[in-house]
Amino acid sequence: MQWAILSGIEGNLAAYEAVLKDLRQLRQSVTELYVLGDVIGLQGKNEGDNKAVIRRLRKPEEGELKPQVCIGWWEEQCFSLHGMSGVPDAPELMAAVGGDGVKALWESVSRKQVEWLRSQHFGFHEFDCLLIHGSMAGYADELTPETPAIELCDRLIRADANHLFCGRSGRTFECWVTPTHLDSTVTTLDGPQPTQDQSKSSRRIIGVGSVGRNPGEATYTLYSPGSNQLSFRTVNYEQVRHEKAKREKAKGFGSR
């Protein structure tokens, strides 16, 4: 069993296609494909790339795995623009990309596609792993090796997992947390609950990389839950116009 864990396509169709091609060339086949949010964005080089990425995710080609998708920062901004969240008018998006960026995102995804994105998961709990865009604290939570250890401990406790895979930072990293003594207490309406010892075993947070954020270079993660083996992949690719890509495909580019 081997998982491919992606994040941050950000509308970069060429990058996603490059990763899919790389997956086909692996010696050990992938059994599950996870995409941890930010499937849309403003990194596409062609008009309509966000729509094309969503179509590609929804309808894989014959022989390809159906991706399991969760919601990321860019999707949440899209929901805000379309009145599908508790925060209207996407103030986070406006602060990040300005009015032109807001307009570009609004025009790049159809209402039906936004509804499909809204139906996707917040995260995935598999075995002793949590796969999520940010963390249980929220979609915008950006964990990195520089995040304070006590904060990483908090996120792992909230995740109730030994391995937390996240994509918000866009970086590839592996960060082990080994608390020597850590207790947690939950307070409910009935008062404080019994203290729990959280220091029994080492846990880790894994940054899974970014497929589309860095032009020409896609990064993603492979993980085998049976052997606990983890590896990071880097794929270099050339960004091309749609017309050229179609001609290459007609010649057998990427065929099995």
List the predicted regions and their residue ranges.
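Active-site environment of divalent metal-dependent phosphoester hydrolases
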Residues: 10-15, 41-44, 74-79, 137-139, ...
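Short amphipathic alpha-helical segments
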Residues: 17-18, 47-48, 82-83, 143-144, ...
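Beta-strand-turn-beta hairpins that frame and shape the catalytic cleft
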Residues: 1-4, 124-130, 199-205
